Amino acid sequence: MSLPLSLQTLVKKTVASQCLSTDEHCILKHCGLWWHDVPLKLCMDRGQIQIKSGFLGEDIDLHIALIIAVKENNYSLIKLFTEWGAHINYSLLSINTEHIRELCRQLGAKETLEDNDIFRIFTKIMHNKTSGRIILCHEIFMNNPNIENKFTIQLRGLICKRLWGLIEIKETDELNDLLVKYWYAKAVQYECKDAICFLDEKYTDLNEWRLKCLLYYNKIYELHEMYHKEKVQIDVHDMICLASTKDNNPLTIYYCYALGGNINQAMLTSVQYYNIGNIFFCIDLGGNAFEEGRAIAEQKGYHFLSHSLTLDIYSSDASLPLNLKDPEEISSLLKDYKSKNLSIIWEYSHNIL
């Protein structure tokens, strides 16, 4: 006679929470606590159930584990994860057969997933920026027919916000293309090498995008590697402007300036995006586009910045050498650098307030 389901669930949950020797792995296999060729284990993280498995070598939130199990058509784990507390409606994101759909209905799933739920799942997976999370997000969302139009609008908005200045989204841009660029940018930002390799293997046209991401995220060593050794290049004036669209990017701004980039153009781009740190660093390097910058600031409604650029109190920083091109030397130069002109405007502001 079989045990009541609730007791089976409790026993499996207890076993999965234990550290068992390799000699006892046969027990886990017999109990259905085996996934991706390794023991399936439970742990708690800030009150949330996490699954330890062989999938991408990372702990996975229980709800996300359910999505993967559904995508793999793994009937036993779908039931098990649901019994352990996974929200069955998450399954709607990865259902790909009618048999699985019927199983999920029996377990209480709705017919469709709300757009806000889809968006919440996406942001939940991407909350921790690791190679595993980026690859997982790719596997779940890429070419997914279960994604509705409203979610597409939400996701476009998220990408536009997170990559402000790096990407300009057009109505004609395909969601899949935008997703790949977003995941690649996050992989570059957080130095997720496995995710970069994964995306490079799947998509062969990302070299220029990677160069742009390196500029945007102030990654001078990788930028130097691509620009000089791999010979992936774009116009140096475009490069310095792109480096200026995100604030506090002294390394890549300096690097592009040393290559011949127009520092005044970098200054004006920084004004356009209200990147205060970049603006005054450009002035440190000799930028003097004050009139043009003031006009842009006025047009944008940046009143304090507009006023600041009318002041005759700035000058280039003579202590900064302007000809370094080695990333190690540039990093050493700017490691503890404090902008001369930023200090001047802060002192001025303090005195008049």
UniProtKB/Swiss-Prot annotation:
> Biological process (GO) annotations?
taxis
Record-linked InterPro entries: ASFV_MGF360
What family does this chain come from, according to its entry?
Belongs to the asfivirus MGF 360 family.
Function, in words: Plays a role in virus cell tropism, and may be required for efficient virus replication in macrophages.
Name by which UniProt lists this protein: Protein MGF 360-13L
Give the organism the record lists.
Answer: African swine fever virus (isolate Warthog/Namibia/Wart80/1980)
